[in-house]
Amino acid sequence: MSSRHRLDLDGSGRGDRRRSPNRRSRSRSRSPHRRSSPDRKRQIGAVGNMKIQINPYNNQPFSNRYWAIWEKRSQLPVWEYKEKFMELLRNNQCITLVGETGSGKTTQIPQWAVEFMKQQQQGQPPGQARLVACTQPRRVAAMSVATRVAEEMDVVLGQEVGYSIRFEDCISERTVLKYCTDGMLLREAMNSPLLDKYKVLILDEAHERTLATDILMGLIKEIVRNRADIKVVIMSATLDAGKFQRYFEDCPLLSVPGRTFPVEIFFTPNAEKDYLEAAIRTVIQIHMVEEVEGDILLFLTGQEEIEEACKRIDREIQALGADAGALSCIPLYSTLPPAAQQRIFEPAPPNRPNGAISRKCVISTNIAETSLTIDGVVFVIDPGFSKQKVYNPRIRVESLLVCPISKASAMQRAGRAGRTKPGKCFRLYTETAYGSEMQDQTYPEILRSNLGSVVLQLKKLGTEDLVHFDFMDPPAPETLMRALELLNYLQAINDDGELTELGSLMAEFPLDPQLAKMLITSTELNCSNEILSITAMLSVPQCWVRPNEMRTEADEAKARFAHIDGDHLTLLNVYHSFKQNQEDPQWCYDNFINYRTMKTADTVRTQLSRVMDKYNLRRVSTDFKSRDYYLNIRKALVAGFFMQVAHLERSGHYVTVKDNQLVNLHPSTVLDHKPEWALYNEFVLTTKNFIRTVTDVRPEWLLQIAPQYYDLDNFPDGDTKRKLTTVMQTLQRNAGRGY
């Protein structure tokens, strides 16, 4: 598929263009222009082999657009494997399918599963199982693919085809095919352990090994033992599918090749000091120097980097003047609204009258590795990094870190360049780094994450023996013990490891356990309206916009919202102001606030409100004029995050309670003083240890709200214990005096 070269980014033109003898060609001799017969064309919309022109899903005539899309579908590599797939599905309960990205598996296999389900239902009395579910590891993919498949089936999105993601459902009574995040299907299983309404379960992108996918696979193995009528399809884009095949009792494996063209791979001769700078430089070079028409796909690690790159590339292109071709920069990350996500499928701008080539440049997180296929991409830029969760159970710190990708991810990224014509992949790292420093496969998320949410969900599902749960890769016992300890301190499970009534209620919220506990407790403290808003703001990316060229103005704008007690209450001020200004985008722009983030937070708040209403949790507020208004909110924060507190030592440094980690307040905090006790939302590992999103709290609240955790008899010696002991003695004296 590729040949390897060295990439010259200093403009000297001295790049090494040696072909690697170890790289073998993966180009295929498949014809890209197979035509279909008229008979097959008429059959495709039918259930079974009847040649009909009526859509069987809505009883409407097929549109002209349907047939135009059908022509493209019939060219997909997976198309010729339909009969083989249907045969395997009829004769087996589980199937493993390997299909390279772009083979069409994500859009076609679920449609064929619906067709299979309809065939099975003919002549049968109506049953519960009338749905096909296809899981995706990312919400962007679930929404985007559902939109595409609704077009292919000539139905309305949200009717026969829909999607379900955290905080948003787009389905109806008519839905027969549902794309959903793996986390949403797992949440459904909590209330329906056998997933009775589903006839076919499809786990797509299983190779990504997300937490939810790994738990789902264990649950599905149990469901298969109890439901002979259910069918399961495990789909992967990598050749590591043998592991999935063995896990599911050596089920049949169907391999579908992609249609790939040769891809030249370029490495940098030396390591890049600033991969973002190198990536932007490479985009401009490709656009100006490459004579082949084709779009660019750049992989970056997150929203902030992507937005920054888009701005800088736009500025550079404008500076080149009208003689340069147009370059349309399109961001892609998980929190983009659906309409913005669909821009990646738009064509590139037209070429200039002077012949200069115009292109689009999609700048994406690793969602574009396998979850979405973007036609027209000829040039891929791979800096070699992605954001990954990393958890240290000994100090109970989970951080989202920028980490090197695996070789498997690098190969997937390179493959995006060879979808429609021969392409090029520019790797912004050395060939030596690729060969000796990158892991072969991405480490499964279950081996590097805090398992608090997972254990809570498993307990809700009735799993008693966590140690012997059928994990594909069992997590370390220490990580499981830390999760059980967390849930016990939060009173979600009792000392025998059994789920409490509070824990059962916490599991109903699509939130981390600490946030769920905080939200539930806030009803008793008469501040659930405010905690709803804070929880929503903590569940979305940072709302602050801080452009390099306007940092002073952005910081001044942020200071206008600052609350003296810290960042959580500052976020509450921002949300209140956003609503008071009628959710005005111009107000957001003027105040350096991300409008998309605020709209997402508002949606999250609405969904959480519905969960509260469903379980009769009061939505209340303390009188704003009362001195207890902010005190109650801060106490509610402590109810959820009492384990995430740092104490200011005599040395002037902060030390985390119990774990004794030296930390600093993050520079982004609005606090203009150093509180003695600081509750934090996030532990950030960079060149230093930082705590981010911080609020000033009182030590007596820690002792009163979480006495089990702050049992001073079991506390490590040190300045923190001495201070808390003094506070405890004061509380006891006051109690004795009847205060």
From Swiss-Prot:
Q: Which family does it belong to?
A: Belongs to the DEAD box helicase family. DEAH subfamily. DDX15/PRP43 sub-subfamily.
Task: Supply the name of the protein.
Answer: Pre-mRNA-splicing factor ATP-dependent RNA helicase ddx-15
GO biological process terms held by the UniProt record: mRNA processing; RNA splicing; rRNA processing
Q: Please classify the protein's predominant subcellular localization into one broad category.
A: nucleus
**Compositionally biased spans, kind Basic residues:** 20-35
Q: Does the keyword ATP-binding apply?
A: yes
Q: List the disulfide bonds.
A: none
Query: Where's it found, cell-wise?
Result: Nucleus
Q: Where is the Helicase C-terminal domain?
A: 282-462
Recorded hits in Gene3D superfamilies, A to Z, give:
1.20.120.1080, P-loop containing nucleotide triphosphate hydrolases
Catalysis: reaction(s): ATP + H2O = ADP + phosphate + H(+)
What molecular function terms (GO) are annotated for this protein? ATP binding; ATP hydrolysis activity; helicase activity; RNA binding; RNA helicase activity
- Stretches the record annotates as Disordered: 1-49
Give the keywords, sorted. Answer: ATP-binding, Helicase, Hydrolase, mRNA processing, mRNA splicing, Nucleotide-binding, Nucleus
Which stretches does UniProt call biased (Basic and acidic residues)? 1-19
Gene Ontology CC: spliceosomal complex
Positions with a binding annotation for ATP: 99-106
| SUPFAM superfamilies in the record | P-loop containing nucleoside triphosphate hydrolases
Q: What is its EC number?
A: 3.6.4.13
